[in-house]
Amino acid sequence: MQNYQQPLRVGVGGPVGSGKTALLEALCKAMRDHYQIAVVTNDIYTKEDQRILTEAGALEPERIVGVETGGCPHTAIREDASMNLAAVEALAKKFGNLEVIFVESGGDNLSATFSPELADLTIYVIDVAEGEKIPRKGGPGITKSDFLVINKTDLAPYVGASLEVMERDTERMRPERPWTFSNLKKGEGLQAVIDFIVERGMLGVRG
């Protein structure tokens, strides 16, 4: 008989360098005093994101597990999510009372999606530095994720990106689906992500 609770599993995806790990660090630090949290990171050949989160003090080290996927990062979160499912189950059993487990995908493209067996909610992170055209390119990450984060808004003037254009295209590509602009260096947009997780994940507001 299962003697541990099933946590809410939140998948966090997005291209390399978009700010997935920075978002996870910020989420963990903001939520850890109110909820029981753990993280599973995915890297192809290393456990670099696990190391970054651990050294940043996002959570206690034993709450952060790194998975080396090898090969294509899409497969490890979609077609064959067995390594990630095993890591999630191991963490849930170890702590018994986990309420949220974040699963960070390896760097991927706009077509990557999480298996519904692995993630109850999905957050997709893109960044302004990739260009204002990214939202209108579509792909499941843009159109199907439960929540979209457009990060690094502070870079817009330097890359010639119009936030107004990005907002218009985002609203067109994912009507009725929530999203936010963010500048995680300053904490901008973070609360919108937390509110989404708490509300959609039915966690209950605390703190």
UniProtKB/Swiss-Prot annotation:
Keywords: Chaperone, Cytoplasm, GTP-binding, Nickel insertion, Nucleotide-binding
Main subcellular location: cytoplasm
GO terms for cellular component: cytoplasm
Localization per Swiss-Prot or TrEMBL: Cytoplasm
Pfam family for this entry, one: cobW
CDD domains: UreG
GO molecular function: GTP binding; GTPase activity; nickel cation binding
GO aspect biological process, one term: urea catabolic process
InterPro entries (alphabetical): CobW/HypB/UreG_nucleotide-bd, P-loop_NTPase, UreG
Organism superkingdom: Bacteria
Binding-site residues for GTP, renumbered to this chain: G14, P15, V16, G17, S18, G19, K20, T21
Record's function text: Facilitates the functional incorporation of the urease nickel metallocenter. This process requires GTP hydrolysis, probably effectuated by UreG.
Subunit structure of this chain's protein: Homodimer. UreD, UreF and UreG form a complex that acts as a GTP-hydrolysis-dependent molecular chaperone, activating the urease apoprotein by helping to assemble the nickel containing metallocenter of UreC. The UreE protein probably delivers the nickel.
HAMAP family: UreG
UniProt similarity note: Belongs to the SIMIBI class G3E GTPase family. UreG subfamily.
Name of the protein described by the UniProt record: Urease accessory protein UreG
Species this protein is from: Pseudomonas entomophila (strain L48)
Gene this chain is encoded by: ureG
